[in-house]
Swiss-Prot record:
Known role: Transports viral genome to neighboring plant cells directly through plasmosdesmata, without any budding. The movement protein allows efficient cell to cell propagation, by bypassing the host cell wall barrier. Acts by forming tubules structures that increase the size exclusion limit (SEL) of plasmodesmata, thereby allowing viral ribonucleocapsids to spread directly to neighboring cells.
Subunit details: Homotrimer, through the coiled-coil domain. Interacts with VAP. May interact (via N-terminus) with host prenylated Rab acceptor protein 1D (PRA1D).
Name listed for the protein in its UniProt record: Movement protein
Family assignment from sequence similarity: Belongs to the caulimoviridae movement protein family.
Keyword terms: Coiled coil, Host cell junction, Host-virus interaction, Transport, Viral movement protein
InterPro entries found in the cross-reference section: Caulimoviridae_Movement, Viral_movement
Native species: Cauliflower mosaic virus (strain BBC)
PANTHER family noted in UniProt: CELL-TO-CELL MOVEMENT PROTEIN
């Protein structure tokens, strides 16, 4: 089965049924790609913390019923570990920070899922993003001053500050530059903009080095991720959010994503708890009703003051009408 089916493509698939492992390879004139998938059975030594709620501590029940309940509510943790790599040449016209490269796509994930048994495939609901290793290699001689900036962002996030997963700045004067980003979060396979979750932005500063149409560098990236049936299936190693290989320390540096400062605001407890709210996931309809809130907010006090002023004006208008009518 071809990973990226195209014309004039040489592809290879090898499978080790004993080890529950599959390797997909594809190569053509545009580049090379390879994918590795390993089932959870081969990685039982990886420790996982599960979210559990023991029925026996909630309900008082006979032993026989307790055993039946355990069987009824047991859930198998389905995990498929994947490593995907791809290589492509970049036109200097496209290396100016104006375009993005999606490092993981819905199409790729669907191809991974298509190799699973139907009963397992239908349970898969999450993708966990573990690590992204990026290698840039120049397509010109060594010794040319060619600064480059790279950022990996979650482009679903609207804030340009909060969308940053990691950034690196280096130079291709020595021919190559490499770094690793660790996103370490999971997302639903049903999220609308899945292809924008891992977006690579690159800015090649020496824009006059070549003309449009010339390939200035090669980007090779490797993404390690896991497909699971639960958001609670995966634990991540305690790595930094971004790392620069030791050999590149002198010619580059990295910038980690910022962790917010949480403000302990004890005054703001306003939350809408009105009745007749829409069901989560259902199509919303406009409703007119009373808004009941926990806590006092500035907006609610302002509304009360406005109502008082309106009431006063109505009383004044009423008195004026009485005077005009001679009452």
């Amino acid at each position: 089965m071809d990973l990226y089916p195209e014309e004039n493509t040489q592809s290879e698939q090898s499978q080790n049924s004993e080890n529950n492992m599959q390797i997909f390879k594809s190569e053509n004139s545009d580049g090379f790609s390879s994918d590795l998938m390993i089932s959870n059975d081969q990685l039982k030594n990886i420790s996982k913390t599960q979210l559990t709620l023991e029925k026996e501590k909630i309900f008082k029940m006979p032993n026989v019923l307790s055993q039946v309940m355990k069987r009824a509510f047991s859930r198998k943790n389905e995990i498929l570990y994947c490593v995907s790599t791809k290589e492509l040449s970049v036109d200097i016209h496209d290396a100016t920070g104006k375009v993005y490269l999606p490092l993981i796509t819905r199409e790729e994930i669907n191809k991974r899922l298509s190799s699973l048994k139907p009963e397992v495939r239908k349970t898969m609901s999450m993708v966990h993003l573990g690590a992204v290793k990026i290698l840039l290699k120049a397509q010109f001689r060594n010794g040319i001053d060619t600064p480059i900036k790279i950022a990996l962002i979650d482009d679903r996030i609207n804030s340009r500050r909060d969308c940053l997963l990691g950034a690196a700045k280096g130079n291709l004067a020595y021919g190559k530059f490499m770094f690793t980003v660790y996103p370490k979060f999971g997302i639903s396979l049903n999220t609308q903009r899945l292809n924008q979750t891992l977006s690579l932005i690159h800015d090649f500063e020496n824009k006059n080095l070549m003309n449009k149409g010339d390939k200035v560098m090669t980007i090779t990236y490797m993404v390690g991720y896991a497909l699971t049936n639960s958001h609670h299936s995966i634990d991540y190693q305690s790595n930094a959010t971004i790392e620069l290989e030791d050999v590149f320390q002198e010619i580059g540096n990295v910038h980690e994503s910022d962790f917010c400062t949480i403000q302990n605001d004890e005054c703001n407890w306003a939350i809408d708890i009105a009745q007749n709210k829409a069901l989560l996931g259902a199509k919303t309809k406009s409703q007119i009703g009373n808004n009941l809130q926990i806590g006092n907010s500035a907006s609610s006090s302002n509304t009360e003051n406005e109502l008082a002023r309106v009431s006063q004006n109505i009383d004044l208008l009423k008195n004026k009408l009485k005077e005009i009518c001679g009452e």
